[in-house]
């Protein structure tokens, strides 16, 4: 009698099963500290989560803007003398800076670290064609109000990037303004519809007899 191999049993048990796809977590990074947010995101990536980071241009770094700008300009001067094309590569956009920060907190030379890094996507602003409406989360322990004292100076990452070569801050600002205005119009429309529905429901219930109203209340329809 030939027993089935473990591989054949596993294949048979997997047949017809749906492949598990992790839920995508959308993290809103407005007023978050760059290092703290990157550390928590890196840990969640290693646990197998898929993360989309939005509004990276509104991340914050400790210290004044001049100090952080000088530090980043010093980093821009670092290069490989024999062949500068081989690196280090200097990113100017806030999303790339955030990705690089997360990468430095992952074991990126192992397959596990490389797989985790592929699960992260970062954007400036909130692209409506990529990020679904609502459902954004924040990281409370990485927020600026939690980490910094009120008098501590800080730098907004987008403002610093604008001084070191990022060209699209005005474009992002324009798109964000358009998105907020569109969301406000949508909210106003839904509020109007909700108010109309409530008034129509009230009118309909006023025309119902007492006995029928009691029955409706019993089942939670009035």
Positions of the model-derived regions?
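Ribosome-associated RNA-binding proteins
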Residues: 2-222
């Amino acid at each position: 009698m030939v027993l089935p191999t473990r591989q054949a049993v596993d294949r048979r048990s997997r047949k017809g099963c749906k492949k598990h796809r992790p839920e995508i977590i959308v993290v809103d990074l407005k007023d978050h500290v760059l290092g703290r947010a990157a550390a928590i995101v890196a840990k969640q990536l290693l646990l197998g989560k898929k993360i989309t980071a939005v509004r990276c241009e509104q991340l914050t770094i400790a210290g004044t803007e001049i100090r952080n700008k000088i530090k980043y300009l010093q980093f821009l001067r670092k290069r490989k003398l024999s062949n500068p094309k081989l690196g280090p590569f200097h990113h100017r956009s806030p999303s790339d800076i955030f990705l690089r920060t997360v990468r430095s907190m992952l074991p990126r030379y192992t397959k596990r670290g490389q797989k985790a890094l592929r699960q992260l996507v970062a954007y400036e602003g909130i692209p409506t064609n990529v990020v679904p409406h609502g459902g954004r989360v924040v990281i409370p322990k990485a927020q600026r109000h939690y980490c910094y004292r009120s008098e501590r100076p800080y730098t907004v990452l987008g403002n610093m990037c604008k001084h070191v070569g990022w060209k699209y801050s005005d474009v992002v600002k324009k798109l964000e303004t358009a998105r907020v205005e569109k969301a406000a119009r949508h909210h106003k429309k839904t509020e109007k519809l909700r108010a109309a529905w409530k008034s129509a429901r009230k009118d309909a219930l006023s025309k119902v007899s007492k006995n029928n109203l009691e029955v409706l209340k019993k089942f939670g329809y009035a």
